């Protein structure tokens, strides 16, 4: 796939980018180079290759799931305007 000069100008217009003819020609070359690279990558046979999320087989170190703060629910709800059954009540906004 390659872009024509008119297509590059149209894309620039849609993106609200002012572009001169020289800039459009340069941009056309850059974009067509990118499309050629994509075509080369798509031509590679990847049959039998398992997809991967990362280039290296590493895993994230996880910290221990431990409580670090005490339960302050009662203190927070003591200053709330209205609560019911441990839940905060708020005024109805949408009818």
From Swiss-Prot:
It holds the Pfam family GatC. One of its GO terms (molecular function) is asparaginyl-tRNA synthase (glutamine-hydrolyzing) activity. InterPro entries: Asp/Glu-ADT_sf_sub_c, GatC. Keywords: ATP-binding, Ligase, Nucleotide-binding, Protein biosynthesis. NCBIfam families: gatC. Heterotrimer of A, B and C subunits. Allows the formation of correctly charged Asn-tRNA(Asn) or Gln-tRNA(Gln) through the transamidation of misacylated Asp-tRNA(Asn) or Glu-tRNA(Gln) in organisms which lack either or both of asparaginyl-tRNA or glutaminyl-tRNA synthetases. The reaction takes place in the presence of glutamine and ATP through an activated phospho-Asp-tRNA(Asn) or phospho-Glu-tRNA(Gln). This is Aspartyl/glutamyl-tRNA(Asn/Gln) amidotransferase subunit C.
């Amino acid at each position: 796939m390659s872009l024509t000069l008119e297509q590059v100008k149209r894309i620039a217009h849609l993106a609200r980018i002012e572009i001169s003819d020289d800039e459009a020609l340069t941009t056309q070359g850059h974009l067509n180079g990118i499309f050629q690279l994509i075509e080369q990558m798509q031509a590679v046979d990847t049959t039998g290759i398992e997809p991967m999320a990362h280039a290296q087989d590493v895993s994230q170190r996880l910290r221990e799931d431990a409580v670090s703060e005490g339960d302050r629910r009662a203190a927070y709800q003591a200053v709330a305007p209205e609560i019911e059954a441990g839940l905060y009540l708020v005024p109805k906004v949408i009818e």
